């Protein structure tokens, strides 16, 4: 018997609605980007994927995994990134077209965990048109995380088990790890006043690991995206 003849039980399980399966949740992070001594190079991807999976688990929306690419502003140099157009045209659009074809998805929420990916916001309408999908770009993670590889990411990372607590002192070495707070990234600080302001704060006040804060940040991001799922039903 052909698998196409199998009637799927869309109303089974602990889900918001049988229609929730038409909503996809996919993470967009950055897999190869320095985060000091205490966080791994794929911190953004791990945080975004965790939030995306938890939202899919709690709502029943279809978990679509993660995009493999990321982009970045040309004045921020702390990792390996794609040009924005390559990310959009060679990674995101083809992957979403395949997702729609295979799973009959109608809407996709992109859970963003990397600030540089904000460059693609101007292309969301294009992505939607090319893929024939409703696209929602959610920034709930990065809107609250603060300076790069500092308190926000360290705290969320600690909750997830990816922060190396034994390396926090080494993490403070801005000469060896200039990307932490972007303290040592002169070009980034010269080009973006907000980055410079945050870097000055980190130089003066440092950072901390706060498990309660990290848990709250992860849960608040999930709650915001869950509300987006509900709006789509």
UniProtKB/Swiss-Prot annotation:
Pfam families attached to this UniProt entry: Creatininase
Keyword Chaperone recorded: no
Top-level taxonomic group: Archaea
GO BP annotations listed: F420-0 metabolic process; riboflavin biosynthetic process
Family classification: Belongs to the creatininase superfamily. FAPy deformylase family.
Quaternary context: Homodimer.
Protein's UniProt name: 2-amino-5-formylamino-6-ribosylaminopyrimidin-4(3H)-one 5'-monophosphate deformylase
Organism field: Methanosphaera stadtmanae (strain ATCC 43021 / DSM 3091 / JCM 11832 / MCB-3)
Gene symbol of the encoding locus: arfB
